[in-house]
Amino acid sequence: NSWENNKNIIFSGSLIWVFLLIIVGFLNYLVV
């Protein structure tokens, strides 16, 4: 059960990083 919780935390964390990368890339696209 703890492994399932850790997997969910890692998955949600990676989703947040992907979202941040998309925002940064979009801002760079707007600036350029």
From Swiss-Prot:
GO biological process: photosynthesis; photosystem II stabilization
Annotated disulfide bonds: none
InterPro entries found in the cross-reference section: PSII_PsbZ, PSII_PsbZ_sf
Membrane topology, from the record: Single-pass membrane protein
Source organism superkingdom: Eukaryota
Ranges annotated as spanning the membrane: 9-29
Compartments, as annotated in UniProt: Plastid, Chloroplast thylakoid membrane
Gene Ontology cellular component annotations, sorted alphabetically: chloroplast thylakoid membrane; photosystem II reaction center
Keywords: Chloroplast, Membrane, Photosynthesis, Photosystem II, Plastid, Reaction center, Thylakoid, Transmembrane, Transmembrane helix
Entries under Pfam families matching the protein: Ycf9 (PF01737)
Task of the protein: May control the interaction of photosystem II (PSII) cores with the light-harvesting antenna, regulates electron flow through the 2 photosystem reaction centers. PSII is a light-driven water plastoquinone oxidoreductase, using light energy to abstract electrons from H(2)O, generating a proton gradient subsequently used for ATP formation.
Family: Belongs to the PsbZ family.
Subunit structure: PSII is composed of 1 copy each of membrane proteins PsbA, PsbB, PsbC, PsbD, PsbE, PsbF, PsbH, PsbI, PsbJ, PsbK, PsbL, PsbM, PsbT, PsbY, PsbZ, Psb30/Ycf12, at least 3 peripheral proteins of the oxygen-evolving complex and a large number of cofactors. It forms dimeric complexes.
Protein's UniProt name: Photosystem II reaction center protein Z
Originating species: Euglena myxocylindracea
